[in-house]
C-alpha cells in the first residue's frame, strides 16, 4: 500500500555480492575467510550479508570449499557462546523458507550442504535454518539472486564480460579484482549502491558513507539561498 506513497521510502532485500575477477580467480582460496564472514556475520540476516558469489569460471571447487566451511556452523542454543545463528520467532517460518528454496532448485542448481546438516534444525527450544550454499551455472536461475533470513548464498558462474549487466540490484558489492575495465564497469553500474574494491567484507560499513543516503536527504529538500544584507 506504500509503494506509490512519496512520503514513504521503501527498502527491500540487499542481494549483496562478492565478485571475483578473472585476474584473481586462481587465488580464490585466499578469500575464503572473507566469503564466510560476509555470509554468516550477524546470523546472515542483514541486507549487507553476501547472498551470492559471482565468478567468471567453473566454480564447483569454490562451492565445495565454501560449503565445507559453512557446514561447520550449525544451530546451537542461544546461550551457547559458540552460537552464530538466530532462531526464528515463528517456528513455522524455517520450514516454509526451506520448502521455498527446495521448490526453486530444479536441475540447474545443487545444494552443496545436503547430506551434512539438515537445513531446518532444533536447538535449545528454538527453530533455526543451518547455512545453505547453492551452486548454479546460470545467472537466470531463481536462486542466483535469492536472499533469505539466514546464511544463504549461491555461487554463480557467468562470463566476466557480461557479469556487471547480469548481477541485478546489489546493495553492496565487494569486487576482488585489479582489472581496471571491470572496476570501471562496476563504478558506472546503476545496480550497485555500495562498492568495496579489494578484500573488504560486505558487512563492513563506513558510517560516514551511507549507501542509501542520509535520512535528511529524504525528509528535506536542499536549496541554495542568498539574501542581501541590510
Residue ranges and their predicted role:
Residues 1-138:
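ALDH superfamily catalytic-core signature
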Residues 36-37, 68-72, 121-230:
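Conserved C-terminal structural/oligomerization subdomain of aldehyde/semialdehyde dehydrogenase
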